[in-house]
A protein has these predicted regions:
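Active-site catalytic motif of lipid deacylating hydrolases and related acyltransferases
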Residues: 25-126, 263, 287-288, 292-333
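Serine-dependent carboxylesterase/thioesterase catalytic core
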Residues: 89, 107-220, 225-231
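Short, highly selective alpha-helical patches that border small-molecule cofactor pockets
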Residues: 75-79, 138, 234
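Bacterial N-terminal signal peptides that target proteins for export
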Residues: 1-9
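N-terminal secretory targeting signals
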Residues: 22-26, 138
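Hydrophobic h-region of N-terminal signal peptides that target proteins for export
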Residues: 13-21
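Hydrophobic/aromatic beta-strand patches that form the interior of the parallel beta-sheet core
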Residues: 64, 93-95, 189, 219-223, ...
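C-terminal catalytic-base region of ester-bond hydrolases, centering on the histidine
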Residues: 199-334
């Protein structure tokens, strides 16, 4: 079953001409009954059984997991956590090297163009999750898409690692051409991203923008540690704020959490007790406390559960929008 599901979400890559090609989409065929079951899901309340039996039948948006500047711990363990929770591995895989993590030493403009490339072909905007400097890159991508660093962004083919020499795509939801500029990322999460490293690394252009989240994010969650010398926090954490319509949340992590080891969450999905807690978690609602003698280390439980809640929510929303848009345009989901 797992192999069949993974095969169902493989990408059909279509070459695009200078003016943009018709989106090829994912090689996924859903019957009408399955589509109706997906459309009936409540994105804010997806149970483990609904994810396993219904949502897993749908294609999943790509997730770009951006690691920190010193990858003593990459984002691969966090990606493995999401795979263990039920997210398709292919949607987390870096096409450049087949790994489950992305370097944060990347041109954010190129990454913005890559998101557009995927959206045009798959009909679903990727999500961004960044740790430390990776979080800065995720926020920089949002500002790139908002036009803060230029008035156009070229489409970038991640498989060829080359530009397509165009700054417009064919929007798969409307069939019309549109610029890359202004595309909206459905969900962005950043972990322990601070201003001190921006100073030390000479990333001056992001100092004034690091805590400002533009409209190019639909939903953004910033996770911070109050005591985090690496990020430059000494007893308090600066908050992120929307400069438009983005829905922005700030989450302070427990003192037991560590800047470097925040991506280490896989064991939380493998332990029955912590997995059940994560599956019941919903931001702002009471969840029973776990005993401190629970087998896995609980330091990373809060952000793992919070991110997983948002990932499955936006997986559902993107899948539902894909179905609706293709029905409207009378294009089979294939």
């Amino acid at each position: 079953m797992v192999a069949a599901r993974r095969a169902a979400v493989m990408v059909l890559v279509a070459s695009a001409c200078a003016t943009g090609a018709q989106a090829a989409g994912r090689e996924t065929t859903l019957d009408g009954a399955t589509e109706e079951r997906i459309l009936a899901l409540d994105p804010n309340n997806i149970s483990a059984s609904e994810l396993r039996d219904v949502l897993a039948q749908a294609p999943a948006p790509r997730i770009v997991d951006l690691q920190g500047s010193v990858p003593l711990v990459t984002m691969a363990p966090f990606a493995e956590f999401m795979v263990a929770m039920g997210y398709p591995r292919e949607s987390l895989t870096n096409p450049a090297d087949g790994s489950l993590t992305y370097s944060s030493f990347v041109d954010a403009r190129k990454l913005a163009g890559t998101l557009a490339w995927y959206y045009e072909r798959e009909g679903m905007m990727p999500m961004l999750i960044g740790h430390s400097q990776g979080g800065m890159i995720a926020i920089r991508v949002l500002h790139e898409l908002a036009g803060d660093f230029g008035d156009s962004i070229p489409v970038w083919d991640p498989l060829r690692d080359a530009t397509e020499e165009r700054s417009v795509i064919v929007d798969p939801r409307t069939g019309l051409q549109r610029p890359v500029l202004g595309l909206q990322v459905p969900y962005v999460a950043v972990l322990a991203t601070g201003t001190l490293p921006r100073l030390l690394l000479g990333q001056w252009s992001m100092l004034s923008r690091l805590r400002e989240i533009p409209d190019t994010a639909a939903e953004f969650t910033g996770f911070s540690l109050e005591w985090d010398p690496i990020a430059g926090n000494f007893g308090s954490a600066d908050t992120y704020r929307a400069i438009g319509s983005a829905r922005v949340r700030n989450v302070v992590l427990p003192r037991t959490a560590s800047h470097i080891t925040l991506p280490l969450a896989q064991e939380l999905a493998l332990d029955p007790v912590t997995r059940a807690w994560i599956e019941r978690y919903s931001p702002g609602t009471a969840v029973p406390e776990l005993s401190s003698d629970t087998n896995p280390n609980l330091a990373n439980l809060l952000h793992a559960a919070d991110i997983w809640y948002s990932v499955k929510k936006h997986w559902c929303l993107e899948a539902q929008e894909l179905i609706r848009s293709r029905r409207t345009r009378a294009v089979p989901l294939q």
